[in-house]
Each structure stands twice: as C-alpha cells, then as structure tokens.
UniProtKB/Swiss-Prot annotation:
InterPro entries: UCP032146. Belongs to the UPF0262 family. NCBIfam families: PRK02853.1 (NF002769). This is UPF0262 protein y4uD. Keywords: Plasmid. It comes from the Bacteria.
Length: 165
C-alpha cells in the first residue's frame, strides 16, 4: 500500500460554524487546503483510503466523522475539548497579540510572538495526536493542520465557552 492511500481526500466542516472574521476564514481555508494536499491519516484497523473527514460539534465535544472515499462510514470519534482548554486560550491570546503587533510592532517583536505561537501549536498538535490515537493515527503536520482547523472552528463560534475562560 502506498502512503497516498492513507490521506484525506475531503474535509467538511459543520456549517453551523459561522463568522465574518476574514482572518479566521483564511486560517480555516488554508488548513483545509494543506490537509488535502498532504496528510497522513490512518484509521486504526482500516486497510486503506483515501478518507473523508467531517468535523462537527455535539454536546460540547468535537466529533470527527471518518468515511472512505465513497462515503461509507468507518468511525466517529468524540473528542472532549477540556484537555485543550489552556492551549486554545493561550493560542487565541497569542494570535490576537500577533495580529495587533502586525500593525504596531517591529519585526523582532513579530518573530518573538510567532515563536511562542509555534510552540503552543506544537504542544497542542502533540496532544491532539495522543487524543486521537485510539481511532486514527496522524503525523505531526496533519495534527498541526487539524489543530489549526479546530482553533478556527471555535474562533468562528466566538461564543464557545472554551475560548471565553
């Protein structure tokens, strides 16, 4: 089997996530494109893809619905956001600081903020890999892109409690 068979061919997002924030829309679009271009996505016990992924919310949890390329259901995984609370809040504050600094700060300040943002992103991606490992194996880059997508989805729904605490 080639590595190309264990990848995402479609990423769909729950349409109830709405925003008018162009930064969030751009982050989301880039994450989806990156996932479609290059991802390692291996549902445990499944023999090959490519795969379709739909991310939604149910009862305050993220739900990853995984299907094969023809749409046949493989597995759904409900993921609690509680372990991500601190990282999501830190990442949110860091991103806001970065956006503000783009208008007011020098290059060194932007680089320092970006280094901190990348560190938080890496930590969150590793946590995501661990939390998904019972149902799907993903590489570091796929985990980073999925975390970006989760952040963008929650930021779109700015009333979501996880980003308010």
């Amino acid at each position: 089997m080639t590595g190309a068979e264990f990848r995402l061919c479609d990423v769909a997002l729950d349409c109830s996530f709405k925003t008018r924030d162009q930064r969030v829309e751009r982050e989301q679009a880039l994450a989806v494109l990156d996932l479609l271009e290059a991802s390692t996505f291996v549902p445990v016990g499944h023999h090959g893809g490519p795969y379709r992924l739909k991310i939604s919310m149910a009862a305050g949890r993220l739900v990853f619905h995984i299907a094969d390329d023809k749409g046949a259901h493989i597995v759904s995984h409900h993921l609690s956001l509680a372990p991500f609370r601190r990282l999501l809040n830190d990442y949110s504050r860091t991103c806001e600081g970065y956006y503000e600094a783009m208008c007011r700060s020098n290059l060194e300040r932007l680089q320092a903020i970006d280094m901190g943002r990348r560190g938080i992103h890496d930590e969150a991606a590793e946590l995501l890999r661990e939390r998904l490992s019972a149902k799907v194996d993903i590489d570091k880059d796929t985990a980073r892109r999925l975390f970006t997508l989760i952040y963008a989805l929650l930021a779109r729904n700015s009333g979501h409690q996880i980003l308010l605490n």
